[in-house]
Curated annotation (Swiss-Prot):
It catalyses: (1S,2R)-1-C-(indol-3-yl)glycerol 3-phosphate + L-serine = D-glyceraldehyde 3-phosphate + L-tryptophan + H2O. This is Tryptophan synthase beta chain. The beta subunit is responsible for the synthesis of L-tryptophan from indole and L-serine. The modification N6-(pyridoxal phosphate)lysine is found at residue 92. Transmembrane segments: none annotated. GO terms for cellular component: cytoplasm. The gene is trpB. Keywords: Amino-acid biosynthesis, Aromatic amino acid biosynthesis, Lyase, Pyridoxal phosphate, Tryptophan biosynthesis. Tetramer of two alpha and two beta chains. One of its GO terms (molecular function) is tryptophan synthase activity. Pathway: Amino-acid biosynthesis; L-tryptophan biosynthesis; L-tryptophan from chorismate: step 5/5. The keyword Cytoplasm does not apply.
Length: 400
């Protein structure tokens, strides 16, 4: 994997990715691709990016040895990359800072975004306030009900939250609506996509902004334990936190990479969001080609996960490619496993993780006991769980 290079000039990662959009969007995406290419080669752009990551987001985020949890499980040592400590409480802001700087460079006055759990919506509203832009966030009506605290946060930050009533009223539908809006107002509007998916150049761009996670982790693990972890694990919905951790490790062949999809009620039921693990065929959604949960007529299937942020029927194209070339292993954690991991991290480490991140913790909980005490698992703790306490309380039958 030393010579891993993706995507190609057409935005493909192997057979995944690309640009599958209506004619009306082609000029906007071309303008974006050109602007990003120029920014990518401009040291001043990265200087501004690093400045905001340090002084505004509070990076670098630390790596932390979850010693009590490791001892309780008996086996591998579990370390956490603490993305939950970023401003706004998740990894999402790494990407929104980058895209907002690009929007500013392109002279756009308005940003729009889609959101599932509300984390990307909050991160987009945050950077819009930071850079003086107006912001509209598209959110499925069902997700609005699940994530009221984040909806209020976005409004506090000055954003307009647009409820999407069509389809399954979740992330997929919010993304459809945001893309429609972008077509209508492409002149003054920049669309901040929140995950490593969508039409080219988004998957590459989001990955590049999120790679700060893996780049920091490599240096930090070297300093902390004198070597790299045996396994690096992250949850995968669209997959931006995971690609940010994995990409810098692709060339490190002795580091096993594990992506954890949302197993929901089980991949043998219709209620999950695990396109790779469930063996979903390739399809096109939201402007890119990738593994996609669909029926025999190519209709996109409904999904289910206890975490709104993993509740997506597709997966970022680079993840599909990394699965194809067997560099990353993809597996699932079910709702109940994620909830158990959530409880364990709260009780043993005093850290309330996001339900999304709890899926990655669940893999460590399950696998650490099978490994040696001298082995190390690095978990990307992609976000904090304040936004999920209502969901968890409801599942436990507790009224807040």
């Amino acid at each position: 994997m030393k010579n891993y290079h993706a995507p190609d000039e057409k935005g493909f990662f192997g057979e995944h990715g690309g640009l599958f959009v209506s004619e009306t969007l082609i000029p906007a995406l071309q303008e974006l691709a050109d602007a990003y290419k120029a920014a990518k080669n401009d040291p001043e752009f990265w200087e501004a990016f690093r400045h905001d990551l340090k002084h505004y987001v509070g990076r670098p985020s630390p790596v932390y040895h979850a010693a009590r949890l490791s001892e309780h499980l008996g086996g591998a040592q579990i370390w956490l990359k603490r993305e939950d400590l970023n401003h706004t409480g998740a990894h999402k802001v790494n990407n929104t800072i980058g895209q907002a700087l690009l929007a500013k460079r392109m002279g756009k006055k308005r940003v729009i975004a889609e959101t599932g759990a509300g984390q990307h919506g909050v991160a987009s509203a945050t950077v819009a306030a930071r850079f003086g832009m107006t912001c509209d966030v598209y959110m499925g009506a069902d997700d609005i009900q699940r994530q009221m605290p984040n909806v209020f946060r976005m409004k506090l930050l000055g954003a307009n939250v647009v409820g999407v009533e069509s389809g399954s009223r979740t992330l997929k539908d919010a993304m459809n609506e945001a893309m429609r809006e972008w077509v209508a107002r492409v002149d003054d509007t920049f669309y901040i996509i929140g995950t490593a998916a969508g039409p080219a150049p988004y998957p590459e761009m989001v990955r590049d902004f999120q790679c700060v996670i893996g780049n920091e982790a490599k240096a930090q693990m070297q300093e902390a334990i004198g070597r790299q972890p045996d396994v690096a694990v992250a949850c995968v919905g669209g997959g931006s936190n995971a690609i940010g951790l994995f990409h810098p490790y692709i060339g490190e062949e002795n580091v096993r990479l594990v992506g954890v999809e949302a197993g929901g009620l089980g991949v043998n039921t219709p209620d999950h969001a695990a396109p790779i693990t469930s063996g979903a065929p390739i399809g096109v959604l939201h402007g890119f080609r990738s593994y996609l949960m669909q029926d025999e007529n190519g209709q996109v299937l409904g999904t289910h996960s206890v975490s709104a942020g993993l509740d997506y029927p597709g997966i970022g194209p680079e993840h599909s490619h990394l699965h194809d070339i067997k560099r990353v292993e993809y597996t699932v954690a079910k709702d109940d496993e994620a909830l158990e991991a959530f409880d364990l991290l709260c009780r043993f480490e005093g850290i309330i993780p996001a339900l999304e991140s709890s899926h990655a913790v669940a893999w460590a909980v399950k696998n650490a006991p099978k490994m040696g005490k001298d082995q190390v698992i690095l978990v990307n703790l992609s976000g904090r769980g304040d936004k999920d306490i209502n969901t968890v309380a409801k599942l436990k039958g507790i009224k807040l």
